[in-house]
Amino acid sequence: FPPKEEMISDFNWYMHRHRENFTKEAFERRMEYGDEVLRNYYDKYINSWNKVVAVERNIRGVVYNGVPLKGKLDKLEFNGKEVNVVDYKSGNIDNAIPKMKAPHEKDPNGGDYWRQAVFYKILVDNYEQKEWKVISTEFDFIEPDKKGEYRKEKITISPEDMETVKQQITEVWNRIQARDFYTGCGKPDCHWCNFVKNNNLAVTLHDLEEEIAD
């Protein structure tokens, strides 16, 4: 792996490239915080990272249950043909835990991150150019929790999970095809809108529809 300073240099370059998005004080705080967090993150995992990986992998041309899908994945870790999908997250992991829950009585559609994990498996498993098989999706939080610990949460996906999300994907696609859904209802707690937004389906499928129309 590259040395730690190269990672920090990349972070600094990116921050300066987007300097206009911050006030002077916010930029300085973010630079200081990012430097500290990334150095500690590097030290935590440098000796355990999988070296057989693909990063920022675009997957296109997938058709699942008659629905065209595409996506960009942060990282794929390989053990032969078996894949662990890694999705990097920032923010407080404790606030994210409910989003990783499978469907239950209070949230029959499942959490946003849970749906994202299942969507990744559907996408990769049905990518005909490769014979990859997703065994898990891992959410890697680059910011420490309240105790200063860096944490990862891994989700394994069952056939029942895939069937649930398949039905959701199909429903979204049918509504888009009927020009019945574009921007959503605007309610922040709407399961429907959150599913589309967090799995990039609205953008992906809308873009595809425009391409077909052209």
Regions found by a protein language model. Give the residues of each.
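A generic structural signal for short, non-catalytic loop/turn and secondary-structure boundary residues
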Residues: 47-52, 64, 130-132, 185-186
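Conserved aromatic-histidine-acidic binding/catalytic patches
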Residues: 22, 26, 105-112, 157
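Residue-level signal for well-ordered alpha-helical scaffold segments within enzymatic catalytic domains
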Residues: 36, 40, 84, 119-122, ...
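Short acidic (Asp/Glu) and glycine-rich catalytic loops that position anionic groups and cofactors
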Residues: 14-17, 89-101, 140-152
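Non-catalytic protein-protein interaction segments used by genome-maintenance enzymes to assemble
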Residues: 54-127
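Metal-dependent nuclease catalytic regions and adjoining charged, substrate-binding loops involved
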Residues: 5, 110, 114, 121-214
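A non-catalytic, helix-rich entry segment at domain boundaries
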Residues: 1-58, 62
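Short, well-ordered strand-loop elements centered on a beta-strand within folded domains, enriched
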Residues: 8, 53, 82-87, 136, ...
